[in-house]
Amino acid sequence: VSKKHLFNLNEKIKEKYTCFELEIENLDNINLNINSWLGESENNDVKKTISVIKTNKLNIDWLIIDHYAINETWENEIKKYVKNICVIDDFTNRKHNCNILINQQINEKEIVKYKNNINSDCKICVGNDYLLLNHQYYQLNINKNIEKLKRINIFMGGSDIYNITEQIIDICYDYNKKNNLNIIFDVIVGKSNKNAEKIKNKI
């Protein structure tokens, strides 16, 4: 289930999977505030998602949620229509009600940050062991000798709303200059990156 956001990947998803698209009520109200990214209230969004489940008579064993604007309000409603919920989370400041929560950004010592924000029977999976990475990358021979490093790939996600990419480029250029190096930096930006042209002109 996916929204019809600008620069969405729905058509790509449809090449291999079934994709149920939801209309966005108010595209103009979407801004840097992650709570606006659904394009409407959580209540309206979850009702539409439940309608998809009912209309298509879907029997869902696992519902995987990957969206910054969704929290326990949405999950409490959908829980009645699915067997299990897995949440992919990058933050620790929202309440969730799920069976499994994955946060690859923190380590085990930081799980305490979820105190009072997660149901007690939730399995919390954190750290690099749960890194969501294409299996092809795991098959690569990683060169751990930094001194021989010649090329670095930079990618900060599809939208990079805070333009971290440009900040990293500046740091990389400074590092090259200060250390008299000639490391090549390949920069990748997503279609929804509003600073794409600015970044392109910079490099």
Predicted regions and their residues:
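Short internal beta-strands
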Residues: 1-4, 184-191
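Conserved nucleotide-sugar phosphate-binding/catalytic loop shared by glycosyltransferases and other
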Residues: 2-51
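Short N-terminal targeting/anchoring amphipathic segment
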Residues: 50-69
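Nucleotide donor/acceptor-binding cores
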Residues: 61, 149-152, 183
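Conserved nucleotide-sugar donor-interacting segment of glycosyltransferase catalytic cores
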Residues: 69-116
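A conserved mid-protein helix/loop that constitutes part of the nucleotide-sugar donor-binding site
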Residues: 159-173
